[in-house]
Amino acid sequence: MACTEFSFHVPSLEELAEVLQKGLKDNFAHVQVSVVDCPDLTKEPFTFPVKGICGQTRIAEVGGVPYLLPLVNKKKVYDLNEIAKEIKLPGAFILGAGAGPFQTLGFNSEFMPIVQTASEHHQPVNGSYFARANPADGKCLLEKYSQKYPDFGCALLANLFASEGQPGKVIEVQAKKRTGEHNFVSCMRQTLEKHYGDKPVGMGGTFLVQKGKVKAHIMPAEFSSCSLNSDEAVNQWLNFYEMKAPLVCLPVFVSKDPGLDLRLEHTHFFSHHGEGGHYHYDTTPDTVEYLGYFSPAQFLYRIDQPKETHAFGRD
């Protein structure tokens, strides 16, 4: 697979915390950003296979929306253990947002990769989830992937944050009561873009929606047989939902595209009450509460970039 490597601008955690504190204040009534020790992510509500998101951090964007839209390209299937090798970090802990491995599932779905990949020292562990619209009633059906399937596949497109999965210092972001127009991730990403300009900064990690509800979507199980050539057509195809806290979210975002046709932000989420999908924004600005832990990425790996591209279907 073709792979392009790019070095991000990596400010200190203290500087990033200061920048995010100022930017988030324009969008939330209560904001507290600080540098802390990463909480133990093996514990609830995260239940990840590793304790942290630190060590040799990188972002990988694999494939892209043009492999899904306007019509699906079913040749575009991937393996997360192989992706870990591509990004020069076998054994990496990978989290993020992507399309479910239809090659195994037999249908299309939203995918929440949470994987400690294989290395010489340990077997891989798959903590991933997938969400689909229940064929019976159209409601969300969230399942843990490894309870049914032994592989480490994904497909079409994925935005991934990878690390050694180590404990360490991270940026903690608390934000309550949204007063602005932007969602939590967009606000952070745009704050970084405004401050750092042409020096791209990449970040990933996890955040909780502790209170409130969010607008989400789940792709249909059947790929579209007719061309979807606009955001309007895509939105008519998608299934939209309102889902309630507590939600565990897996954000990946980049402040500015260095010319690699990136999806600048992409967040999927799961929960322990059967809801999961693609995060758009909260629908309860007065009561919403976010708590997140983030780490800056050192490198970007653009894997299997589509040669023919377009700008729709990336919300």
Swiss-Prot record:
Its cofactor is Zn(2+). GO terms for biological process: DNA damage response; regulation of DNA repair. Its main location: nucleus. Its EC number is 3.1.-.-. Keywords: Cytoplasm, Hydrolase, Metal-binding, Nucleus, Zinc. GO terms for molecular function: hydrolase activity, acting on ester bonds; zinc ion binding. CDD domains: DUF1907 (cd17298). Zn(2+) binds at residues 266, 268, 278. One of its GO terms (cellular component) is cytoplasm. Monomer. This is Ester hydrolase C11orf54 homolog. It comes from Rattus norvegicus (Rat).
